Amino acid sequence: IFGIWAGLLGTSLSLMIRTELGQPGSLLNDDQLYNVVVTAHGFIMIFFLVMPIMIGGFGNWLVPLMLGAPDMAFPRMNNMSFWLLPPSLTLLLASSAVESGAGTGWTVYPPLSSNLSHAGPSVDLAIFSLHLAGVSSILGAINFITTILNMRWEGLQMERLPLFVWSVFITAILLLLSLPVLAGAITMLLTDRNFNTTFFDPSGGGD
C-alpha cells in the first residue's frame, strides 16, 4: 500500500513535469517550484516505489525462490529496512513544504545548497530523508548479498545462478560501494550549513 501510494504520488509529479515541458509557455510560473517537483519525483520513485516494491517485496520473494532457500538470510532485517522509509518520505515531503523547498541542483552543485540559496531547513530535512533512505537501502543490500552467498542449495554454484539473482547481487554490491560516498558528501553539506565548516566553501579551502 505504501509503495502504491508513493507510485501514484510520483506519477502525478511526473505528469506535472511532462505537462510543464510539453507546452511552449510556463505552466507553473515558478522555476524553483519546478526544480522541487523534479527532485521530489526522483527521490519518491527510486526510494519509495522501486526499492520497497520491486526489490523489497518482489525481490525478497523471488530471490530465495530462485536459490532454493526457505527465506532470506535475515528476514527481520526486511522489516527494519522497510520501516525506515515512511519517516524518510515524511521528511522529504516536509522539506518540499518548508519555505521554497529543495531544488534540483542542491545535491550536485554545493553553492546552491548554501544558506544564501536555501536559508530555511528544507535542504536539512531532505538530507535527513536521504540518510534514512540510505540506511534502509544498505540494510536491504546486506540482506541480499548474504542470502545469495550463503543460502543457495548445495548443488547451485555461482555460475548457475539465474541472471535476475546476479543482477540483484551486483546492484547490491554497487549500492554498498556508492551510498557511503553520498552519505559522506551530504553529511559534509549538513555540517557546512549548520556548524560553519568549509568543506564546500571555495574561499575556505576545505576542512
UniProtKB/Swiss-Prot annotation:
Membrane-side (Mitochondrial intermembrane) residue stretches = 22-42, 103-124, 184-207
* Mitochondrial matrix compartment segments: 64-81, 146-162
Q: List this protein's GO terms for biological process.
A: electron transport coupled proton transport; mitochondrial electron transport, cytochrome c to oxygen
What pathway, per the record?
A: Energy metabolism; oxidative phosphorylation
Coiled-coil parts of chain: none
Q: Which top EC class is given?
A: translocase
Entry's localization field: Mitochondrion inner membrane
Task: Give the record's GO CC terms.
Answer: mitochondrial inner membrane
Q: Which cofactor does it need?
A: heme; Cu cation
What is catalyzed by this enzyme?
4 Fe(II)-[cytochrome c] + O2 + 8 H(+)(in) = 4 Fe(III)-[cytochrome c] + 2 H2O + 4 H(+)(out)
> Subunit structure, per the record?
Component of the cytochrome c oxidase (complex IV, CIV), a multisubunit enzyme composed of a catalytic core of 3 subunits and several supernumerary subunits. The complex exists as a monomer or a dimer and forms supercomplexes (SCs) in the inner mitochondrial membrane with ubiquinol-cytochrome c oxidoreductase (cytochrome b-c1 complex, complex III, CIII).
Function, in words: Component of the cytochrome c oxidase, the last enzyme in the mitochondrial electron transport chain which drives oxidative phosphorylation. The respiratory chain contains 3 multisubunit complexes succinate dehydrogenase (complex II, CII), ubiquinol-cytochrome c oxidoreductase (cytochrome b-c1 complex, complex III, CIII) and cytochrome c oxidase (complex IV, CIV), that cooperate to transfer electrons derived from NADH and succinate to molecular oxygen, creating an electrochemical gradient over the inner membrane that drives transmembrane transport and the ATP synthase.
UniProt similarity note: Belongs to the heme-copper respiratory oxidase family.
Record's protein name = Cytochrome c oxidase subunit 1
Natural source organism = Planctoteuthis danae
Q: What is the lineage of its organism?
A: Eukaryota, Metazoa, Spiralia, Lophotrochozoa, Mollusca
